[in-house]
Protein backbone atom coordinates (compact mmCIF):
# COMPACT_ATOMS: atom_id res chain seq x y z
CA UNK A 1 0.00 0.00 0.00
CA UNK A 2 1.06 3.55 -0.69
CA UNK A 3 0.53 6.72 1.29
CA UNK A 4 -1.24 9.62 -0.46
CA UNK A 5 -1.42 13.19 0.85
CA UNK A 6 -4.28 15.42 -0.27
CA UNK A 7 -4.94 19.10 0.26
CA UNK A 8 -8.67 19.59 0.88
CA UNK A 9 -10.12 23.00 0.03
CA UNK A 10 -13.38 24.19 1.55
CA UNK A 11 -15.43 26.93 -0.13
CA UNK A 12 -18.68 28.66 0.77
CA UNK A 13 -21.82 28.87 -1.41
CA UNK A 14 -20.32 31.77 -3.37
CA UNK A 15 -17.15 29.85 -4.14
CA UNK A 16 -15.05 31.93 -1.75
CA UNK A 17 -12.19 30.20 0.07
CA UNK A 18 -13.06 29.28 3.66
CA UNK A 19 -10.39 26.82 4.85
CA UNK A 20 -8.04 24.04 3.79
CA UNK A 21 -6.30 21.09 5.41
CA UNK A 22 -3.88 18.33 4.49
CA UNK A 23 -4.90 14.72 5.11
CA UNK A 24 -3.26 11.40 4.28
CA UNK A 25 -4.66 8.00 3.45
CA UNK A 26 -3.20 4.58 2.65
CA UNK A 27 -4.49 2.97 -0.54
CA UNK A 28 -3.50 0.70 -3.43
CA UNK A 29 -3.64 3.44 -6.08
CA UNK A 30 -4.62 7.09 -6.69
CA UNK A 31 -8.21 6.34 -7.60
CA UNK A 32 -8.75 4.25 -4.47
CA UNK A 33 -7.12 6.99 -2.38
CA UNK A 34 -9.38 9.66 -3.88
CA UNK A 35 -12.47 7.53 -3.25
CA UNK A 36 -11.49 7.05 0.40
CA UNK A 37 -10.81 10.75 0.95
CA UNK A 38 -14.07 11.79 -0.73
CA UNK A 39 -15.98 9.34 1.46
CA UNK A 40 -14.34 10.58 4.67
CA UNK A 41 -14.45 14.31 3.81
CA UNK A 42 -17.58 14.87 1.67
CA UNK A 43 -17.85 18.60 2.49
CA UNK A 44 -14.58 19.55 0.79
CA UNK A 45 -14.93 21.44 -2.49
CA UNK A 46 -11.60 20.36 -3.98
CA UNK A 47 -9.34 17.36 -3.47
CA UNK A 48 -5.77 18.04 -4.60
CA UNK A 49 -3.21 15.22 -4.55
CA UNK A 50 0.05 16.77 -3.38
CA UNK A 51 2.22 13.75 -2.63
CA UNK A 52 2.35 9.97 -2.92
CA UNK A 53 4.88 7.67 -1.27
Language model: regions and residue ranges:
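Short aromatic-glycine-(Arg/Gly/Cys) micro-motifs in beta-strand/loop hairpins
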Residues: 1-18
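Terminal low-complexity, poorly structured segments
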Residues: 4, 14, 27-30, 45
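N-terminal processing/targeting junctions
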Residues: 12-14, 23, 48
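A short, exposed loop/beta-hairpin motif centered on an aromatic-Gly-Thr core
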Residues: 18-28
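Short, mixed-charge low-complexity intrinsically disordered segments
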Residues: 39-53
Amino acid sequence: MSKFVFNLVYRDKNGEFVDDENVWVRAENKLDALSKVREEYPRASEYILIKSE
